[in-house]
């Protein structure tokens, strides 16, 4: 007699759902998870080893519960790059931006509360909402994947959400949200109740525009979420962080697990922050490759969404999954992200991008034959 998940007393809202995950396939070129394709530079690897070696001497003790040194350095990074002064009291860090989002929803969402996001957008927002017992509301986007301000305001007024998610640059479309739109949505949310507005800036270092950190001034219900997985090329580190009013930082600590950031994680992140200039140099290379992908895909004849991230959404396809498979058959893995008619490709190294472009050129020739 077989026994499966349906035989367990799983919460009703989790039944029939699937866990988050992109395919992990062994192919020559993997451009499906928006990772930074460049390995960490050797001087940084050596510095990580030094810091981890020092931390290892004290692993018999719990790590710094409040990650004071790390939060101080993150605040310095945000101040230097975000055109807005940020102090340690404004910063909180966790195991990836997903844990940051989880802690925010545990604090401000939960049973009997709601969260709204404007989809298609980062699917983990909805998944984490369900995991925390927060009812999820799918807000509208326009045909061009931008946020229709009038429709979004109406959705907020009707649903009265406790948490509002705005992802900019947006994943999976790559589109940025103008500051004036974010401000308008913040004001719309505050007009109905004291809602928390979370701006997810996971890809902001790749944007043509600036961070929205300056909007934090005078807006205690606004949160900016970040990650070290993308621009810092440290997806394996799992380090996310937020900037917000000090009261928000105090609030999320009500739900954090004790000593949630390991000494090894803190040591590694601190080493990476010492090499910010080098790592952001790779970001400039990836931005150039992203722009090249946009131009080349349009020249080949595909529709391409404007991108402010390290990936490009392209289409349109009658059967996107079939095209995904045809690209995979040519040794290149891209992402079928569930947006009907569209696929997403991460910006890789020039050689990886050439392999991808060769594959889609070949496909286009076959389609036109």
From Swiss-Prot:
Gene3D superfamilies noted in UniProt: Aspartate Aminotransferase, domain 1 (3.90.1150.10), Type I PLP-dependent aspartate aminotransferase-like (Major domain) (3.40.640.10)
Keyword check for Transferase: yes
Reported cofactor(s): pyridoxal 5'-phosphate
Keyword set includes Transport: no
Pathway(s) where this gene product acts: Amino-acid biosynthesis; L-histidine biosynthesis; L-histidine from 5-phospho-alpha-D-ribose 1-diphosphate: step 7/9
Signal peptide start and end residues: none
A GO BP entry: L-histidine biosynthetic process
Pfam families, per database record: Aminotran_1_2 (PF00155)
GO molecular-function term, one example from the UniProt record: histidinol-phosphate transaminase activity
Protein name per Swiss-Prot or TrEMBL: Histidinol-phosphate aminotransferase
Gene (name only): hisC
